């Protein structure tokens, strides 16, 4: 689960920045798209030709996927990824940011089973 933290329009392109990274969902950097769904704060009626969804690392390989002719994603909207993350606990580097929260899907929804790391966790 990642959240949209910023959007930028650059020329004809719409860049959508998430608080997640490709390290979180594809540590081998092989996939071009993911099984995903969107949790929107409000229904968007404006469709955008192309939206490039990128991670928070600002590295050129941190491009997650591109949406074509889809409703505009806005700050606060969330992306729920499915069938990813099996190796991210062991392969994600502590580069640029600490380990993210880990959620467990339960019968009643989602439960946080590990909070995002802080400096104190790194010093253990």
Q: What is the predicted function of each stretch?
A:
Residues 1-124:
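Charged (often Lys/Glu-rich) extended helix/loop segments that serve as interaction or gating elements
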């Amino acid at each position: 689960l990642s959240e949209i933290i910023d959007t930028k329009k650059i020329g004809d392109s719409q860049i959508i920045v998430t608080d997640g990274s490709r390290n979180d969902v594809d540590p081998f950097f092989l996939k071009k798209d993911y099984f995903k769904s969107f949790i929107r704060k409000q229904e968007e009626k404006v469709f955008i030709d192309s939206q490039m969804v990128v991670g928070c690392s600002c590295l050129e390989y941190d491009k997650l996927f591109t949406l074509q002719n889809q409703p505009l994603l806005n700050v606060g909207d969330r992306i729920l990824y499915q069938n990813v993350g099996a190796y991210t606990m062991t392969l994600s580097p502590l580069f640029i940011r600490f380990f993210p929260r880990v959620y467990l899907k339960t019968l009643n929804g989602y439960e946080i089973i590990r909070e995002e790391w802080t400096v104190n966790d790194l010093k253990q």
